[in-house]
C-alpha cells in the first residue's frame, strides 16, 4: 500500500471536509411605538444605535448567531395603527421578542395591555418568548412585580425569559465588533441581556424541528393565499378588459346601425255606411276619354238602348228625387255601383257621334242639384 504524500494529505482533507450548513431562525420583535426595539437589535448586532428613525411598517435585521444558526429578525412597528399586522407574523417565526417600555407608568401600562393581546393569540402559544424591559430612564423596578403584571401562565409557552436593557451608554461608539457573531459578542461583553438572549436561542435550537414544522406550514399557507390573491386580481383585470372591449363593440354596432324610422300610424276605420259600396278596377284610360271631367261617371242603363252611350250619365252623388211622406220613417240607403270617371266609346260598330258631340251630350245631361 503506497503512502500518500504530504500534498495529497493536505488537499484531500480540505476537499473532503463536510461543509457546515447554517440553519435559519426567524424571530419577531414586537412592542409599542418608541419602546426601543430597533435600538436593542442594533446593540445586539454590535452597531451604533444613535440617530435611528422611527420604524413604519416593518424592517428585516439579519445577523449571525454562531457557526450553526443565523438569525432573521422582523422588526415590526408598534403604533396603534400598525399593531393590527402583528398577527401576520406570529405563525411564521420560531420565537417572540417583546420589548416593554418602562419609561413612564403610562407606557408601561400600554405595553402590558399589548402583551396580553399578543400572548392570547393561539399561534404564539408553545413558542419561546424573550421579555426585555427597556428602562431608558433608569427607574427602579421589581422583577417579581413585573413578572406578575405580564400574567403569562407557566407551561403556556416553551420558555419565558426576562431581562432588562438600560439606556445606551455609548460603549459601542469606538468598538468595531459588528463582525463578531452574537455568541462571540456575548462571551466578550458578558451583559445580562446578552446571556438571557443566548439562553433564548438555545431553547429554540432544542425544539427547532418542531418549531420549523409550524413555520413551514404557515409559510406554505401564506404562499397559497398570495397566489389566490394574485389569481383573483388577474381575473378582475381580465373582467375589466372584457367589459371595456364589449362596450367598444356595442358602441361600434350602434354607430353602424341605420336610423330607426318612426312607426307609421294605422289607417282610420272605414265608414260602415260605405261598406256596401264596391269599387271596380278601372280599365286603362284611352286618349278619347282623357279630357272627360273627373266628376262624370257612367251608370248602368236601365231603360236606355245599347246604342245610346250618353243617355244615362250621372254625377257621383245620391238621388235628387223629392222625399215622400211615407219614406220619413224608413230611410233606405241607395246602392250605387261606382265606375271610373271617364266616358266609354259606343259598343255598336262604327262611331255614330264624333268626340266633341259625345262630350257635349254628357255636359247637357248633367243633373245639377237644386
Swiss-Prot record:
Specifically expressed in ciliated sensory neurons throughout development in both hermaphrodites. Keywords: Cell membrane, Cell projection, Cilium, GTP-binding, Isopeptide bond, Lipoprotein, Membrane, Nucleotide-binding, Palmitate, Ubl conjugation. Residues 366-369 are annotated as: RVVP region. Sumoylation regulates the targeting of membrane sensory receptors to the cilium. One of its GO terms (cellular component) is non-motile cilium. GTP binds at residues 31-38, 75-79, 134-137. The RVVP region and palmitoylation sites are required for compartmentalization inside cilium to prevent distal cilium and nuclear targeting. This is ADP-ribosylation factor-like protein 13B. It comes from Caenorhabditis elegans.
Amino acid at each position: 500500500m503506497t503512502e500518500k504524500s504530504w500534498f495529497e494529505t493536505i488537499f484531500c482533507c480540505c476537499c473532503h471536509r463536510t461543509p457546515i450548513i447554517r440553519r435559519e431562525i426567524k424571530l419577531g420583535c414586537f412592542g409599542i411605538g418608541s419602546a426601543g426595539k430597533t435600538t436593542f437589535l442594533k446593540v445586539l448586532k454590535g452597531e451604533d444605535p444613535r440617530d435611528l428613525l422611527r420604524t413604519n411598517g416593518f424592517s428585516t435585521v439579519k445577523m449571525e448567531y454562531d457557526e450553526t444558526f443565523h438569525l432573521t429578525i422582523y422588526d415590526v412597528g408598534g403604533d396603534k395603527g400598525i399593531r393590527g399586522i402583528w398577527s401576520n407574523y406570529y405563525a411564521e417565526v420560531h420565537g417572540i421578542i417583546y420589548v416593554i417600555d418602562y419609561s413612564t407608568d403610562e407606557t408601561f401600562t400600554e405595553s402590558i395591555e399589548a402583551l396580553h393581546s399578543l400572548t392570547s393569540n393561539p399561534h404564539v402559544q408553545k413558542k419561546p418568548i424573550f421579555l426585555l424591559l427597556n428602562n431608558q430612564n433608569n427607574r427602579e423596578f421589581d422583577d417579581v412585580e413585573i413578572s406578575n403584571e405580564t400574567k403569562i401562565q407557566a407551561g403556556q409557552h416553551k420558555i419565558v425569559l426576562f431581562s432588562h436593557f438600560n439606556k445606551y451608554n455609548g460603549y459601542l461608539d469606538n468598538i468595531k465588533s459588528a463582525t463578531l457573531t452574537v455568541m462571540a459578542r456575548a462571551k466578550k461583553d458578558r451583559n445580562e441581556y446578552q446571556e438571557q438572549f443566548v439562553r433564548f436561542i438555545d431553547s429554540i435550537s432544542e425544539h427547532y424541528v418542531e418549531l420549523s414544522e409550524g413555520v413551514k406550514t404557515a409559510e406554505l399557507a401564506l404562499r397559497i393565499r398570495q397566489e389566490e390573491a394574485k389569481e383573483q386580481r388577474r381575473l378582475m383585470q381580465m373582467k375589466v378588459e372584457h367589459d371595456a372591449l364589449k362596450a367598444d363593440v356595442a358602441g361600434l354596432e350602434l354607430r353602424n346601425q341605420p336610423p330607426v324610422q318612426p312607426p307609421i300610424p294605422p289607417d282610420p276605420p272605414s265608414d260602415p255606411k260605405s261598406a256596401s259600396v264596391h269599387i271596380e278596377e278601372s280599365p286603362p284610360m284611352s286618349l278619347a276619354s282623357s279630357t272627360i271631367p273627373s266628376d262624370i261617371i257612367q251608370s248602368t242603363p236601365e231603360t236606355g238602348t245599347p246604342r245610346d252611350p250618353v243617355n244615362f250619365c250621372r254625377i257621383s252623388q245620391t238621388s235628387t228625387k223629392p222625399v215622400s211622406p211615407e219614406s220619413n220613417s224608413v230611410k233606405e240607403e241607395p246602392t250605387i255601383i261606382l265606375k271610373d270617371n271617364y266616358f266609354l266609346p259606343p259598343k255598336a260598330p262604327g262611331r255614330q257621334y264624333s268626340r266633341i258631340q259625345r262630350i257635349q251630350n254628357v255636359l247637357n245631361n248633367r243633373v245639377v242639384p237644386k
